[in-house]
From Swiss-Prot:
Record-listed E.C. numbers: 1.97.1.12
Protein name: Photosystem I P700 chlorophyll a apoprotein A1
Lineage, opening ranks: Eukaryota, Viridiplantae, Streptophyta, Embryophyta, Tracheophyta
One Pfam match: PsaA_PsaB
GO terms for biological process, alphabetical: photosynthesis
Source species: Nymphaea alba (White water-lily)
Entry-linked SUPFAM superfamilies: Photosystem I subunits PsaA/PsaB
Gene encoding the protein: psaA
Reactions catalysed, as given in the entry: reduced [plastocyanin] + hnu + oxidized [2Fe-2S]-[ferredoxin] = oxidized [plastocyanin] + reduced [2Fe-2S]-[ferredoxin]
Alphabetic keyword roster: 4Fe-4S, Chlorophyll, Chloroplast, Chromophore, Electron transport, Iron, Iron-sulfur, Magnesium, Membrane, Metal-binding, Oxidoreductase, Photosynthesis, Photosystem I, Plastid, Thylakoid, Transmembrane, Transmembrane helix, Transport
């Protein structure tokens, strides 16, 4: 008798042709909503169209349909990203001085944009060195291209075309997986399989293939470039991949192939998989051999992580079990029910992912300057400042987005009847304690951090420098930060005996790396000035968290409005006849949180910009004397509010204000224009709906008089629309002003 194991049941995970492709449908504005599809009666229609076009929850209640729309939209997003990348590479191929920069990256500035003199604006094409005139770019693409082994503009062309092909492929995939073969809900909820593919596939194999590229292509090409070989003489990437002898000339252990791997004699590979620490003195970037080693290690970790969860084979972790086992003696039911929340609410899922990605983006901002990963990045001060600022802003927006979607989850997806005594329920039940304590912390930090500055301004104004908090009078040294710095500076000799230097030169230890007479990085001293501004950071971050967390915890109900959940995510007030209930919706908390996020990030990027110009960036003489851009004035000037205004904002804005008539004049115009956009926002934030409705009605009267009245009735913006337009212009104007101020300054002095 033959006993067979039962045949595995094949689950059909897609529906065929669920939604027909219809261009007529797409051409009808608002086809996703009965009300909007009727067309406009009033001008509010266009606002509703924009507000609801991507709010898939408002189109349908069917979770499967919502999931498919989100999934399909992701392919569209990827298509746009590939298109953008293709454009970047195309500019590098067609309009840039990449090959010239590659031959002399210390004296030639990167440029990939040449202004066409259509209206006589050719003055913007500044001399970036090497006889090339164009706009200096600060995105870091040149440094990435060099690190990845791109040596010619032809290679950039090919990559640009490849990215276009991928963009088309993604567009097709988005259409295919919604209209032709749409996944079933069960597929979206199969978290273990998803973890398997995302961890082992995307992150594991992705890192492994990148490590392979770095070892076989980037390392040899960069070795030649560092030695001063003409890029045209360097073998092409495929020659290194196909011809092992070429690599063996640079790294002799390559001649032995995979033998050392299988005989566990891994130290043979230490030539190109290193653990040195510190920066390469030739390029001022991390050792590329360290980076290759890192990606190999990360790949192994993620390949293992991706195989820990139970998929088709009945072994491994079950995520639901892990979450339900996760409870301590004081946490009631713990994470019971969290699995159901995260598999049925995309908003809950998104909130967690945005919070983590936002935090990670801010971590990236801090590592890009302290451990500059690409060759010649550290000495390109404009790019360093831009990368820090960019990643800080993005991180701030993502974290506010996390709070927004957490609140939407609370309003739309949270079911209080099934949740009892789990962690979320317990947090909600003592939300008053959380918010009131957080409020106390904010008041304490605000008064004390600001108070230290006010004290210093007062003493300075009264001519009593000996009574100020400063490194030369009453010291407030950041002793914990200094302790962390020293621990890390001493680490290589203690915890990592194989490493020749610490993870970052910023920790201390006296090393300085300079490339082409410019400082790449050196130990960053921390003193009283940093202690003061650090507490301003603590204050602004805590206030942002207070506003956002209050919005989430009180999204469904509060003492003021017990039935808030019925009013939805955004509403202006709790109806007529209930005074004092405006600006309480979860949306309004996001709105207010954005302003404090803007405050918080502004102080961070100002601190960074001035600190680096004062204590890190500068030139080094043949005798080894470092001259910093602002001559080390941060420690004594930034300890008063007046100092920030006088020696940072005013002194450093001279470049942007005096840029007219030079190649930086576009930044001068942007500086002016962005101030205007910012001021324009105040018109929306400080005036009410009724004011505008009155004005509109008298304008409509005039149109009627002349018989030119439109069929669509004009309406004033609703309260929420006005605030949305206001905060958008406030942030756009503020960020663009900062951008123009930073870049004009750093391009002229850096």
């Amino acid at each position: 008798m033959i006993i067979r194991s039962p045949e595995p049941e094949v689950k059909i995970l897609v529906d065929r042709d669920p939604v027909k492709t219809s261009f007529e449908e797409w051409a009808r504005p608002g086809h996703f909503s009965r009300t909007i599809a009727k067309g406009p009666d009033t001008t509010t229609w266009i606002w509703n169209l924009h507000a609801d076009a991507h709010d898939f929850d408002s189109h349908t209640n069917d979770l499967e349909e919502i999931s498919r729309k989100v999934f399909s939209a992701h392919f569209g997003q990827l298509s746009i990203i590939f298109l953008w990348l293709s454009g970047m590479y195309f500019h590098g191929a067609r309009f840039s001085n990449y090959e010239a920069w590659l031959s002399d990256p210390t004296h030639i500035g990167p440029s990939a944009q040449v202004v066409w003199p259509i209206v006589g604006q050719e003055i913007l094409n500044g001399d970036v060195g090497g006889g090339f005139r164009g706009i200096q770019i600060t995105s870091g693409f040149f440094q990435i291209w060099r690190a990845s082994g791109i040596t010619s503009e032809l290679q950039l062309y090919c990559t640009a075309i490849g990215a276009l092909v991928f963009a088309a492929l993604m567009l097709f995939a988005g259409w295919f997986h919604y209209h032709k073969a749409a996944p079933k809900l069960a597929w979206f909820q199969d978290v273990e399989s998803m973890l398997n593919h995302h961890l082992a596939g995307l992150l594991g194999l992705g890192s492994l293939s990148w490590a392979g590229h770095q070892v076989h292509v980037s390392l040899p090409i960069n070795q030649f470039l560092n030695a001063g070989v003409d890029p045209k003489e360097i073998p092409l990437p495929h020659e290194f991949i196909l011809n092992r002898d070429l690599l063996a000339q640079l790294y002799p252990s390559f001649a032995e192939g995979a033998t050392p791997f299988f005989t566990l004699n891994w130290s043979k590979y230490a030539e190109f998989l290193t653990f040195r620490g510190g920066l390469d003195p030739v390029t001022g970037g991390l050792w590329l051999t360290d980076i290759a080693h890192h990606h190999l290690a990360i790949a192994i970790l993620f390949l293992i992580a991706g195989h820990m969860y139970k998929t088709n084979w009945g072994i491994g972790h079950d995520l639901k079990d892990i979450l339900e086992a996760h409870k301590g003696p004081f946490t009631g039911e713990g994470h019971k029910g969290l699995y159901e929340i995260l598999t049925t609410s995309w908003h809950a899922q998104l909130a967690l992912n945005l919070a983590m990605l936002g935090s990670l983006t801010i971590v990236v901002a801090h590592h890009m300057y302290s451990m500059p990963p690409y060759p010649y990045l550290a000495t390109d001060y404009g790019t360093q400042l831009s990368l820090f600022t960019h990643h800080m802003w993005i991180g701030g927006f993502l974290i506010v987005g996390a709070a927004a979607h957490a609140a939407i989850f609370m309003v739309r997806d949270y079911d209080p009847t099934t949740r009892y005594n789990d962690l979320l329920d317990r947090v909600l039940r003592h939300r008053d304690a959380i918010i009131s304590h957080l409020n106390w912390v904010c008041i304490f930090l605000g008064f004390h951090s600001f108070g230290l500055y006010i004290h210093n301004d007062t003493m300075s104004a009264l001519g009593r420098p000996q009574d100020m908090f400063s490194d030369t009078a009453i010291q407030l040294q950041p002793i914990f930060a200094q302790w962390i710095q020293n621990t890390h500076a001493l680490a290589p000799s203690a915890t990592a005996p194989g490493a020749t230097a610490g993870t970052s030169l910023t920790w201390g230890g006296g090393d300085l790396v300079a490339v082409g007479g410019k400082v790449a990085l050196l130990p960053i001293p921390l003193g009283t000035a940093d202690f003061l501004v650090h507490h301003i950071h603590a204050f602004t971050i805590h206030v942002t968290v207070l506003i956002l967390l209050k919005g989430v915890l009180f999204a469904r109900s509060s003492r003021l409005i017990p039935d808030k959940a019925n009013l939805g995510f955004r509403f202006p007030c709790d109806g007529p006849g209930r005074g004092g209930t405006c600006q309480v919706s979860a949306w309004d908390h996001v709105f207010l949180g954005l302003f404090w996020m803007y405050n918080a990030i502004s102080v961070v990027i100002f601190h960074f910009s001035w600190k680096m110009q004062s204590d890190v960036w500068g030139s080094i003489s043949d005798q080894g004397v470092v001259t910093h851009i602002t001559g080390g004035n941060f420690a004594q000037s930034s300890i008063t509010i007046n100092g920030w205004l006088r020696d940072f904002l005013w002194a450093q804005s001279s470049q942007v204000i005096q840029s007219y008539g030079s190649s930086l004049s576009a930044y001068g115009l942007f500086f002016l224009g962005a101030h205007f956009v910012w001021a324009f926002s105040l018109m929306f934030l400080f005036s009410g709906r009724g004011y505008w409705q009155e004005l509109i009605e008298s304008i409509v009267w005039a149109h009627n008089k002349l018989k030119v009245a439109p069929a669509t009735q004009p309406r004033a913006l609703s309260i929420i629309q006005g605030r949305a337009v206001g905060v958008t212009h406030y942030l756009l104007g503020g960020i663009a002003t900062t951008w123009a101020f930073f870049l004009a300054r750093i391009i002229s002095v850096g």
